[in-house]
């Protein structure tokens, strides 16, 4: 049995606070020129799908926000946060982790808006200053979130209480049978 990711809304709220506090990266003229070159290789469907995915996770405000994106190369404001059942599905082991400990994820702008995942356009941006700025923002948000949990016992308790409530309603069953251990690849 495979498990979906279980969002922890209390933990998401802490992360969202830091996304707003730190703000989104500024981009140079050179970065914008590179982004425009990559954008020219994307299809209308790529952009439409990106807007739809961005909108779905922000509730009604998300749809209005996504429409305002227009042809912007980069998001210039943090997407609206909404408690929603809409999830962006992907191939990840975070789903299982989220059943073992409170887990939250954030999206940081590491690439030109509209870039599909698993494409050469995404890879081309990962080693650029565009990608590094987004990764640096994500790192700051994660670090500040952890610091909050280490220093604010009420925030930590809220995350834990929500996690225990969800787990009580639907217990986690590990898909790996008990007693299975990793084997050595080589001697």
Spans of model-derived segments:
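Metal-dependent amide/peptide-bond hydrolase catalytic core
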Residues: 1-187
């Amino acid at each position: 049995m495979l498990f979906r990711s279980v969002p922890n809304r209390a933990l998401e709220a802490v992360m969202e606070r830091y996304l707003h506090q730190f703000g989104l990266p500024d981009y140079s003229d050179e970065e914008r020129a590179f982004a425009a070159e990559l954008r020219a290789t994307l299809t209308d469907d790529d952009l439409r799908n990106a807007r739809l995915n961005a909108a779905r996770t922000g509730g009604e405000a998300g749809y209005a926000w996504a429409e305002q994106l227009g042809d912007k190369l980069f998001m210039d404001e943090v997407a609206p946060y909404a408690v929603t059942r809409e999830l962006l599905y992907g191939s990840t082991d975070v789903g299982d982790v989220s059943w073992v400990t409170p887990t939250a994820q954030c999206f940081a702008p590491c690439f030109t808006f509209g870039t599909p995942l698993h494409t050469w356009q995404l890879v081309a941006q990962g080693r650029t200053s565009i990608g590094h700025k987004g990764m640096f923002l994500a790192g700051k948000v994660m670090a500040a979130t952890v610091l909050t949990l280490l220093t604010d016992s009420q925030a930590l308790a809220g995350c834990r209480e929500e996690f225990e409530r969800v787990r009580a309603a639907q217990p986690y069953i590990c898909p790996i049978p008990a007693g299975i251990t990793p084997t050595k690849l080589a001697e």
